[in-house]
Amino acid sequence: SVVPNKIYLGEKMTQGLGAGCDPEVGRKAAVESIEEIKSFLEGETRMVFITCGMGGGTGTGAAPVIAKEAKSRGLLTIGVITLPFTHEGIGNRRRATAGINEMQKHVDSLIVVDNNKIYDVFGTKNYFDALPQADEVLCTAVKGIADIINSSAHRNVDFADVYNRMRGSGIARIGMGR
């Protein structure tokens, strides 16, 4: 990954592997790495975006732990998550639902992207082509919020405005169209 600052969650526990579709392993991995997570949240941080795909183990289990820590520090905490494709199976959908319910407890706003819509919006037929397009939707959501704060075109909108609008706002959905 080209990301300059990253944390490998639960290195001892997972030995560099994923959570094997087990959210409890993902949760424990985040707890193992909580001191590193805390260090990322220190300083001038005022807003945190937590993005993940729900339904597997790492994102489903770790994201709520990270969100809880961020929110406990008074940071504006925004989750931007994807629901698994239907063909990924009922188990993934059930884990995703449980993960969303847990995530809601620890974020100010939760933006949910249903991966099934990717096929319709982008005209994609192939699962492997749809994955980067789902990532693009997540990035666009985060960038859109950040741009509102940072753009001079929105002179009357600053972090305080976004904070007040998004603090405790609950679930949001992204509409997609072309």
Set out the residue ranges of the language-model regions.
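Tubulin/FtsZ superfamily GTPase core signature
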Residues: 1-178
